[in-house]
Amino acid sequence: MNNKIVKVGNIEVANDKPFTLFGGMNVLESRDMAMRVCEQYVEVTNKLGVPYVFKASFDKANRSSIHSYRGPGMEEGLKIFQELKDTFGVNIITDVHEIYQCKPVAEVVDIIQLPAFLARQTDLVEAMARTGAVINVKKPQFLSPGQMGNIVEKIAECGNENVILCDRGTNFGYDNLVVDMLGFNIMKKVSKGCPVIFDVTHSLQCRDPFGAASGGRRDQVTELARSGMAIGLAGLFLEAHPDPNNAKCDGPSALPLSKLEAFVSQMKAIDDLVKSFEEIDTSN
């Protein structure tokens, strides 16, 4: 199987290339917080020689509660993203939820993300594809890895081949997620070699069946990330926060920002080791 290369700025994202870290925070809480978090990621990834893309949402449109914080909105969020690009020279990924958001967001950021809950919405998929931007498709929690090929085909039919696929866990009964480690290579195959990345922090979500906010298992983020990186992936998708207990969204799953360097160092070591091995074809 040939591995496709998707270019994001000067970064080559591919399953057989050194992994790219797609890291940041869940939602833009403020301009100052975004600057602080991005600066830390840039410092760590530059030190370790890891390709890096900043991630955050300007609007968490799928919060469970009407009272939950959603973010600064598109207009203010794009201003913050532009300042991050100007200050740190980073590439940026963010999600869109509405057709009208696709074009203006793609004019500022480098990757637009199709949210898991919206991945079957054909009109949105087509609007995103027609921007020509790189698209990161989150695998819905309710969809099998093999079904991701249909979403890639929709995007390709619109003339866009710049697709990254991302696993963020699969429903395991009610209010819980599990990661199918066999699914990563299935997604590689059905997409004919698209880069596949792993959203480790969202995969750690678990819920109170009657609560409005997601719980999480950040004490297990390292072991789950190690498992995913051992597959040989194009990238790792990670959320970190300087004070996870007081984060405005998904704090229980977020890596403490103070642990970032140690964490990324381990992921790089695993990635380097796994990709130094000769591939063994066990199909025959």
Swiss-Prot record:
The EC number(s) this enzyme carries: 2.5.1.55
Main localisation: cytoplasm
Keyword ATP-binding among record annotations: no
Keyword Cytoplasm in record: yes
Pathway recorded for this protein: Carbohydrate biosynthesis; 3-deoxy-D-manno-octulosonate biosynthesis; 3-deoxy-D-manno-octulosonate from D-ribulose 5-phosphate: step 2/3; Bacterial outer membrane biogenesis; lipopolysaccharide biosynthesis
GO MF terms, alphabetically ordered: 3-deoxy-8-phosphooctulonate synthase activity
Catalytic activity, as annotated: D-arabinose 5-phosphate + phosphoenolpyruvate + H2O = 3-deoxy-alpha-D-manno-2-octulosonate-8-phosphate + phosphate
Matching PANTHER family: PHOSPHO-2-DEHYDRO-3-DEOXYHEPTONATE ALDOLASE
Similarity field: Belongs to the KdsA family.
Record HAMAP family: KDO8P_synth
Name of the protein in its database record: 2-dehydro-3-deoxyphosphooctonate aldolase
Organism name: Actinobacillus pleuropneumoniae serotype 7 (strain AP76)
Gene: kdsA
